[in-house]
From Swiss-Prot:
Originating species: Drosophila yakuba (Fruit fly)
Compartments where found: Nucleus
Reactions mediated catalytically: N(6),N(6)-dimethyl-L-lysyl(36)-[histone H3] + 2 2-oxoglutarate + 2 O2 = L-lysyl(36)-[histone H3] + 2 formaldehyde + 2 succinate + 2 CO2
GO BP, one annotated term: circadian behavior
Record-given protein name: Bifunctional lysine-specific demethylase and histidyl-hydroxylase NO66
Residue span, JmjC domain: 341-480
Cofactor: Fe(2+)
Amino acid sequence: MHKASTSSANRANFQGNHKTQKSPNNGKAKAKKSPNTDINVADVEMLLNPRSNLTKEQKERRKMMEGFVTKTFERAENESDGSDIDTSASTSNKGKSKAARPTDRKRRLQAEDSPPADANNNNTKNGKDGKVSKESASTQGASATKRKPPRSQGLEHTSPIQVDGEALACPLVRKSLPAAGASGASGPAKSCPLPEKRKSLPAGAAKSKSQVIKQEALEEASNEAQLLALPIETHKTDSIEEGRRVLQWLLNPIKVNHFFDDFWEHTAFVVQRKNPHYYSKLISFKMIDEMLVRHRLDFTINVDVTTYKNGKRETLNPEGRALPPVVWGLYSEGCSIRILNPSTYLVGLRQVCSIMQEFFHCLVGANVYLTPPNSQGFAPHYDDIEAFVIQVEGRKRWRLYEPPSGSDQLCRNSSSNFDQEQLGEPILDEVLEAGDLLYFPRGTVHQAITEEEQHSLHITLSVYQQQAYVNLLEKLMPIVLKKAIKQSVALRRGLPLHTFHVLGEAQRANRSDSRNQLVENVQKLVTKHLMPSAQDIDEAVDQLAKKFQHEALPPIILPEEQVRTVFGSRSTADEQGNAICDYEFDTKTSVRLLRANILRLVTEEDGSVRIYHHVDNGFEYCKYEPIFMEILPEEAAAVELLISAYPYYLTVGQMPLDSAARKVEVVTALWERGLLMTEKPFK
């Protein structure tokens, strides 16, 4: 390569006979020094050795030499046409950055020369703040220093991380962490083997299994407006349509209808926007730091620390709280950080999830993944969710593969880890940049790795977990069977005495008439008595909906909604100490449900009627037991009317109850539980 030949020539010039060359003018006039003779070095090998004890002057010379070599490489690359010219097997490495070697050498020498306070390499690169580019020796080649099992949580030689020019609260952990380049490896630092360059797919394969959609960059203000702009009268909006609006913002430029017709559950795609700020309001490096400082997040419960090296995935979670210095120390060692429930602490992300769950009628979960440069945190695997990968910062290369078998397509459970040898050709191989979106269906095998000098921060939104027909049938068939047992004597009759002798795995080769007769009888019983009715299906769907009410995030109450709900109510006391409420209903008061899916009306097996809701759910997954209120059977008609009328308002007098007092009583009870909203504020 150009880099190798240039380096050899320079090295030869430095190592000659150490005699000062005469100028072209025979010493009469001092010739201008050339770049190759500007640095007079006594012993280049000593200067290149990071363990050498150098004087101040020698350190300055080493910096000069390093700067010269780096400029030489940059000049050589600028003169090239951008392609790799592989002329030396010892310097070629397929898939690596062309500037990997000089950049790594520069980083190693800077780490050796810098004082301890700068050992974190917090300097910004290319004018961009917040890019953590340091790689510890534990992430370098085969001779790298091995990480010791006990991990210190103490601090030595720390300095704050800089983001947007501000020092964050957490210093990087330096105790027990080796300096970059200490291993002495000659190649670039690696936390895992770089993947081979992508191979071309068979004709038509990429089109049938994945697509890449490019969107022209829009103005940043217009992008934010699509998400943040609310209707003038938010108390009159339809929460399902609001969920569609947020999904449309997520998918742009793909239309929601197009998405469900052409991609949903069968085809992966990437949206490339060239707009790094498209999702930047949802999360950032600085937000994660603030989250760790302000809240108690525990390893394993809220935070996972993972690595994937040499084909092996490891979880390296310490015990206890995920304190910022510990998290960033592990991150600086090359570990990936996964935050399991960020919507608990980030209001903007929680709002996106809570609005989208109205559209999907299921929990919308979110995980955050922060990966250092040239790292992979997870082995190839597939998940049991429809995944929307939102790239917020940096870059990450994603490779998707077909489900291993037909039974893995639209899988019900996530897989174990796959070996690289088990994977075929990728159906999609793309690098996500900030502002890009990747969607893939459940059962799609995937893996992702960051690039040299590029970290990655992305959010994975997950929907439709355990939301398939089979989940409905699991609820439905026990209901059908239980009713059929009561109604059919044939199902309650005893089995023939010879059943065990003609049926079973050991009897599969049995072709007797008695065996065939028994098989036919069982099939007839199922066909005749286990066909579900519409009422049975309704009951089963209610059971699934109860599960959603238990899992769902609580709604975020907007200011215009707050003054119309119990959450904006304030009570006072009179002179005698009696509580005085600031609201009062009458038959002319107009009300509606707070959200389309805020409640579920369910008749239980014992005949009781309950309203399950998620108004008071916690931010953590299923933090509380299912929340419900019990009503009288005759009051269910009023709730059914409110459900069918949404998003429109009804007056209290329109409730199908026998008296005005009863109507006011029922509506007041629902409003006080946070389930209803009035058209006009009481104040």
